Amino acid sequence: MKCFGPFLAVSLLAPAAAGSHPHIFVDTAVKVVVSEAGELQAVEITWAYDEFYSLLIFEDRALDSDYDGTLTAEELAQLQGFDMSWVEGYEGDTYLTLDGEALALGAPEHLSTEVADGRITTRHRRALVQPQAADGVVIKAYDPTYYTAYTVNRGLEVTGGCQGSITPPNLDQAYTMVEELLYAMPAEQAEESYPKVGEAFADTLRLSCGA
C-alpha cells in the first residue's frame, strides 16, 4: 500500500471487507537504466492511477473544482510529488532481487506528475544503493497487502544493450492461495489483517544481458 498523506485519508473511504481487495488499480511502466558495461544503475517507475482513486485525490486536495478531469497549471503544481512522501520502512512497492537476494534501492526522486482524461500519472526514479550487474535481476511491482494492484501494462524499457521480459502472474493459483489463507483465518482476523498475497499477483520482469 502506498504510504503518503492523501492515501491515508482515502483509505478511510474504502470498503472494510477483507475479500474486496484490491481497492486501487495502477497501470505501471518500468524503465531500467543499465550502463553499456551491463551494470544496473536505477529504475524509473511510472504509476497511472485509476480514475476513481484520482478523483479521490482531487477531492482530498480540493482540486478540479469544475469536475472536468483536468487541472489548471496552478492546481497541477500543487499536485507535484504528492505520492513521494513515504513513511519509514515503505519499500515503494518495487522490489528487485538477484538469485533471491534483495537489492536495495535509494530514496525516490520525483520526475513528473501529469493529469489526462481524469487520471493522475506520476514518474519517479530510484537509484540502486549499490550498482549491480543487471543480468538475471528480477523486478516486481506489488503491494504486499494487495490493497493496491499494479499491472505492468505500459511498457518495460531496458537501456544499455540488455533485454527484459515480462511474465504475467498465474491468477488462478493466486486466487486459490487467497481463498485458502482466508478460510484458514477466523472471520474477525480476516477482516482486520488481509494476508500478504500481493506478490502472487505481480508481473515478473527479468533482465538478461549478452548473447
Regions from the PLM with identified roles:
Residues 4-5, 32, 44, 63:
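Short, functionally important structural connectors and interaction interfaces within domains
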Residues 97-211:
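Mature, soluble, non-transmembrane domains
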Residues 23-25, 38-40, 89, 117, ...:
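Short, surface-exposed loop/turn motifs at beta-strand boundaries within globular domains
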Residues 22-49, 53:
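Early extracytoplasmic/domain-onset interaction patches
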Residues 14-17:
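N-terminal signal peptide c-region/cleavage motif recognized by signal peptidases
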Residues 52-132:
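Structured domain cores in non-transmembrane regions
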Residues 1-10:
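Sec-dependent signal peptide recognition
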